[in-house]
Amino acid sequence: MKKKWCLIVACLMMLCCAGQSLAATRAELAAINVSRTGNFKYWTAKAPSQQALVNYVKQITDKKSKDFIPVKDRVAVFDVDGTLMCETGPTYFDQLMYRHRIFNDTSWKPSSKLLEDTQRLLHADKYGLNAVDSDLLFGDCRAKAFDGMSQADFEQYVRDFMQEPVSGLSNLKRSEAFYLPMVEVISYLKANDFNVYLVSGCDRTTLRVLADGIFPLRPGQIIGTDTNYVASHQNGENGMSYMYRPDDTLVRGQFLITNVKMNKVSAIAKEIGQQPVMAFGNSSGDYSMFKYTQAHNPHKTAVFVLLCDDLDREFGNPAKAASVAKSAADNGWVAVSMKKDFKTIYGDNVKKVH
C-alpha cells in the first residue's frame, strides 16, 4: 500500500504532544485468555466473522467430523500491520521508527546519500517510484540506518521507540497498539492446538520485540523482512571464510528481502515447511499468502481479511475497504468489519483525535 511519506514525517514531529497511555497495557494484552469453546469479549454479539471463525474451528477439531484436521497440520499464519496492530498512526511501526532515526535521533548523523534516498521516499511520485521500488528502497535505507548496530542495542532501540504515543489516537502507546479482538483470535487458536506464525512485512527483529510478551510465540514463529547479521569484526569478509571470534558480537548488516506478497509464500514454505490451513491479513500484500493457503490443500481452509472501515475509532479507508471486501467475496474469504464486528479496538479509553 502506497504511503503518504510526508504525512508520516509531520506526524512524527507531533509525537511529543500526546498524553499518558490509558489503553490495555502489555500485561493486560498478554493476559487475554480465550477458552477452547470461544468465550470472546471484544467482539460484537453475533458478529458474522467471529461466528465463521468458531464454526470452522469446531468443525476441524471434531474427531467425528469429515473436516477434522490433526493437530500437526493446524497451522495458522497472520499478517501483523493492519491485521493485529495499528498501521494508521499514520503508518507502519517499522517506517515510523526509520523516520525517527533519520529526523529525530541526535545520537548519529545519516549520510548525505541516505538523506537523498529518504527524500526520494518522501516524494515517490516526483521521482517516479512505484510501490515495489519504494518497498525495495525503504528496505535498503532502513538497513543502512541501523548498519553496524548490535542485536542487543537494536532490540533496545525498538523497545524505546515503542514507548512513543500513537499519532491521532489518545491514550495509546505504540507498544499497546494491538487490536484486542485479534489478540483474542490468537489465544483462541492456541487453545485449540494451532501452531500460529506471524508472517509480516515488518523487520523480523523489530517484530520479535513488539510481539514478545504479547503472544505466546517462540522467536522462530515470527517471520518478517530480513536484514543480514554479521560479526562485528567481519569487515566485509565472506561468511564462508570468516571464523566467528570470541570477542565478536552480532551486528546488523545489509538488507536481504522484503517479506510481502509472493515472498510471504516463499518464506512460509522455507521456514514453516507446511501449508497453512488458516490465514489472516488485511491487504493485497497478503493475497498470495491467502491463495497459497487455499490452493490444492488437502484440508478444509479458512481465510479472514480485515476491512479498514472504521472511521470513528480508527483511520479507516472506505475505498480500500470496499476493494478488499470485493476481493473477499470473489475468493471465498471471510471479511472482518472492524466497524461492525469489533466491540472495541484498543479499549474504550482510546479515542480518535481530530
PLM region spans:
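Asp-based phosphoryl-transfer active-site loop
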Residues: 74-89, 290
